[in-house]
Amino acid sequence: MKRAKQVLYLVISLLVVIADQGLKNYIVTNFKIGDEHTVIPGILSFTYLQNDGAAWNIFSGQMILFYLISIAAIAVVVYYLFNPKYKNWLFDTGLALVLGGIIGNFIDRLHLKYVIDMLQLDFVQFNIFNIADSAITVGIVLVFIYLIFMSEKD
């Protein structure tokens, strides 16, 4: 992968971390735990929660497990992101989003021992999540799209 593309994908990851940590800082500064504020009526609200587990609060309180999983996931993503064998923009963009999301939640776990969640979709019954979670989800979808529909063409 050319140096400029490597930098671009790292910038994407960095932007995810900055957006994630910036919104989390805003929420912590302006909300109390459980506070809800409508952003777009019927669509999106901010609701401040502290999650010491993973998705759906599974493995609650298992910080050592989350540290190990995060470090391993970062290593795997960085390996594939910088491996010249994998040079598709969709695959690499997906990995960059996943990397930024993992780092965003890892920062919370290291400093706070929990992850700050705040995004609530009001039009569907779904867990409250954050920007890092969204980046991981979108990134994984992009990687799967590449693997299912495009990888044999490369």
Swiss-Prot record:
EC numbers for this chain: 3.4.23.36
Keyword Transmembrane: yes
GO cellular component: plasma membrane
Broad class of enzyme this protein falls into: hydrolase
Membrane topology: Multi-pass membrane protein
Record InterPro entries: Peptidase_A8 (IPR001872)
Keyword terms: Aspartyl protease, Cell membrane, Hydrolase, Membrane, Protease, Transmembrane, Transmembrane helix
UniProt-annotated location(s): Cell membrane
GO biological process: proteolysis
Substrates-to-products reaction catalysed: Release of signal peptides from bacterial membrane prolipoproteins. Hydrolyzes -Xaa-Yaa-Zaa-|-(S,diacylglyceryl)Cys-, in which Xaa is hydrophobic (preferably Leu), and Yaa (Ala or Ser) and Zaa (Gly or Ala) have small, neutral side chains
Pathway info: Protein modification; lipoprotein biosynthesis (signal peptide cleavage)
Coiled-coil region list: none
Active-site residues, Swiss-Prot/TrEMBL: 117, 133
An annotated Gene Ontology molecular function: aspartic-type endopeptidase activity
Pfam families xrefs: Peptidase_A8
Membrane spanning stretches: 7-27, 58-78, 88-108, 128-148
Job description of the protein: This protein specifically catalyzes the removal of signal peptides from prolipoproteins.
Family, as annotated: Belongs to the peptidase A8 family.
Protein name: Lipoprotein signal peptidase
Organism expressing this protein natively: Lactobacillus gasseri (strain ATCC 33323 / DSM 20243 / BCRC 14619 / CIP 102991 / JCM 1131 / KCTC 3163 / NCIMB 11718 / NCTC 13722 / AM63)
